Regions:
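N-terminal nucleophile
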Residues: 1-155
């Protein structure tokens, strides 16, 4: 498996956490036993979640439940991801506190959405603000005119 290939040659694998989701929805996960408690991962079709130093082992389950609830609605995929991150944060998240957050979504024939917040006192609020900016009509007008793999000459 891809998980085995990526971890077998890594002498530090016991300290690593690996979460993989491919373009077909297949998932793989690894949590080395030297990661700090509470550690866990959850891998199912189209979704993989994990963490270490979590407030409790249920954090990924809370995130999964929020994600599945929202994907049953007409919410945009990236908004489902953002709301799942917020749910994990609200469920206790990382015991050290949360200072960063990111979302990256790659579409086959469109530009990726790549939002990242580093070292911020309110990373979830800031990530939401960045996402909201991408939905602004003026921004969308610009973004929608950028070249994409299927429309490399648009402007």
């Amino acid at each position: 498996s891809v998980r085995d290939e990526l971890t077998k040659a890594d002498d530090g694998r016991q300290w690593r956490q690996l979460l993989v989701l491919d373009g077909n929805g297949e998932t793989a996960a690894w949590t080395g036993d030297k990661n700090r408690t509470e550690t866990t991962h959850l891998a199912e079709r189209d979704l993989v979640l994990g963490g270490n130093m979590l407030a409790h082992a249920n954090v990924p389950n809370v995130m999964r439940d929020r994600f599945h609830t929202l994907t049953q609605t007409s919410q945009r995929f990236e908004l489902c991801l953002l709301d799942a991150l917020v749910a994990g944060f609200e469920a206790g998240g990382d015991v050290r506190g949360t200072t960063s957050a990111m979302i990256k979504v790659v579409y086959p024939n469109a530009l990726p959405l790549d939002l990242r917040v580093d070292d911020h006192p309110y990373p979830m609020t800031e990530l939401q603000r960045l996402y909201d900016m991408t939905r602004d009509p003026e921004y969308r007008s610009f973004f929608d005119r950028l070249p994409t793999p299927d429309k490399p000459h648009q402007y």
